[in-house]
Amino acid sequence: MESLQKTSDAGQMFDVVVIGGGISGLSAAKLLAEHEVNVLVLEARERVGGRTYTVRNEHVDYVDVGGAYVGPTQNRILRLSKQLGLETYKVNVNERLVHYVKGKTYPFRGAFPPVWNPIAYLDYNNLWRTMDNMGKEIPADAPWEAPHAVEWDKMTMKDLIEKICWTKTARQFASLFVNINVTSEPHEVSALWFLWYVKQCGGTTRIFSITNGGQERKFVGGSGQVSERIMQLLGDRVKLRSPVTYVDQSSENITVETLNRELYECRYVISAIPPTLTAKIHFRPELPSERNQLIQRLPMGAVIKCMMYYKEAFWKKKDYCGCMIIEDEEAPISITLDDTKPDGSLPAIMGFILARKADRLAKVHKDIRKRKICELYAKVLGSQEALHPVHYEEKNWCQEQYSGGCYTAYFPPGIMTQYGRVIRQPVGRIYFAGTETATQWSGYMEGAVEAGERAAREVLNALGKLSAKDIWIQEPEAEDVPAVEITPSFWERNLPSVSGLLKIVGFSTSITALWFVMYRFRLLSRS
């Protein structure tokens, strides 16, 4: 691709200033520059990428310590990365996955661990079916308008799980499902928001799956290259170490000021940072009350991403692929994936320390976390080789002042219906991007691209360069990564829930008892 570079300095007039040099902000800037709009990106850190970050050193070659995964139906990030010359590779699932629960290891294949207890199976099946059916009622672009929005928004996911699930095993796995997908606790998040989140990621199976799901692939060379290559195209239109502290749109032109006292003038602003981080910026005039309230009410999830490197992929000797789903309160890690390079070099296991565990384990030394993780892997995989890594990398996203956490912001109960509708609403000449504002794969790189390009098209419309009907556009399917439709089986659709089974049994028992009484009465009458 040809360079989009254009000289820019403080004091120069720009058409658009983008706040935030993550994938969302940079995809917005790229689209604007392609339409010959004079754009400047102001990034607070010494690097671009935001919540994606590829670390490079002699021990790991490269490693994604932030957002990394892409898969079918994530067509915008796949199209953008292809334009930038990046390739993907599939995360290894050739061997068996592992489910560790109640101190035992159970190998399996597929998206979810199998359940052998028939009552528990009915409970699990009803859980996924109910969540997906509830999600179908929720508009992806306006969850606050769902028919049961107010009712579901008053509930936490803990409330909903307890309402749906009869068995302890299903309740525990459902809680883990929340931890893994949104790095927060079931009692912290709105049921409406979580059901919407799963729905806009394609449903319970798509969001949780590796094959044909959200974790199917990674980028050769790391996901950080997406932002780095856009930065190369934009050249000095991207300013690093420039945290924005002040936005004044009270005059004809907007004034943007950074922490190091640089001033920039522009016609429009795109904010492409997590909603809560806009509280670090002073606005003139003040933000509308709903927007001001919203940004104070969207906490970030908590996660420490951990990569353990080994001399060889010893887990493959046992026909394990490296993916572990771990149900154990004392275990630091809740889920792992193979993080070996696509050519088989640098064998590694990636694991997430999630939610409450991230808070707890952030308080101990890195060496203690490393030891606890190795001991866990040795126990789950049944191999002492897990105790002898050759290198360890980790990233605690809760320490990042310009992210505040990962993967995404979440909505506590009551916030979506009260304030959610303003999340994408412009404030004067300020427009909002960031993965939290997306309607498909929000929380992922795909959502970041959708939001950035949508905000850019909103500005292009304001500049008279684009029709309003072209702001929201459908993305064609990526030919290189086709999606296979996920269709529930006949039994998955029609098996009763545990409560349904009890009703059937109760009804059958009543009919049998009635028949028996009538039969006996007939015999007595004849005698």
Swiss-Prot record:
| Cofactor entry | FAD
Query: Where is it located?
Result: Mitochondrion outer membrane
Top-rank taxon, per record: Eukaryota
> Taking the first listed entry, what is the main subcellular location of this protein, grouped into a coarse class?
mitochondrion
Q: Which Pfam families match?
A: Amino_oxidase
For region Interaction with membrane phospholipid headgroups, the annotated ranges are 520-522
Molecular function, one GO term = flavin adenine dinucleotide binding
Catalytic activity line of the entry: a secondary aliphatic amine + O2 + H2O = a primary amine + an aldehyde + H2O2; a primary methyl amine + O2 + H2O = an aldehyde + H2O2 + NH4(+); (R)-adrenaline + O2 + H2O = (R)-3,4-dihydroxymandelaldehyde + methylamine + H2O2; dopamine + O2 + H2O = 3,4-dihydroxyphenylacetaldehyde + H2O2 + NH4(+)
What are the S-8alpha-FAD cysteine sites (modified residues) in this protein? C406
**Which residues, renumbered to this chain, carry the PTM Phosphoserine?**
S383
In its UniProt record, which GO terms are filed under biological process?
A: catecholamine metabolic process
SUPFAM superfamilies per the UniProt record, alphabetical = FAD-linked reductases, C-terminal domain (SSF54373), FAD/NAD(P)-binding domain (SSF51905)
Which EC class is this protein assigned? oxidoreductase
Membrane topology, record value: Single-pass type IV membrane protein
What EC number is given for this enzyme?
1.4.3.21, 1.4.3.4
Q: Which InterPro entries match?
A: Amino_oxidase, FAD/NAD-bd_sf, Flavin_amine_oxidase, Flavin_MAO
Site entry (Important for catalytic activity), positions: C374
- Family matches, as Gene3D superfamilies: 3.90.660.10, 6.10.250.130, FAD/NAD(P)-binding domain
Q: Write down the PANTHER family for this protein, in alphabetical order.
A: AMINE OXIDASE (PTHR43563), AMINE OXIDASE [FLAVIN-CONTAINING] A (PTHR43563:SF11)
Function summary: Catalyzes the oxidative deamination of primary and some secondary amine such as neurotransmitters, with concomitant reduction of oxygen to hydrogen peroxide and has important functions in the metabolism of neuroactive and vasoactive amines in the central nervous system and peripheral tissues. Preferentially oxidizes serotonin. Also catalyzes the oxidative deamination of kynuramine to 3-(2-aminophenyl)-3-oxopropanal that can spontaneously condense to 4-hydroxyquinoline.
Q: What is this protein called?
A: Amine oxidase [flavin-containing] A
Protein species of origin:
Bos taurus
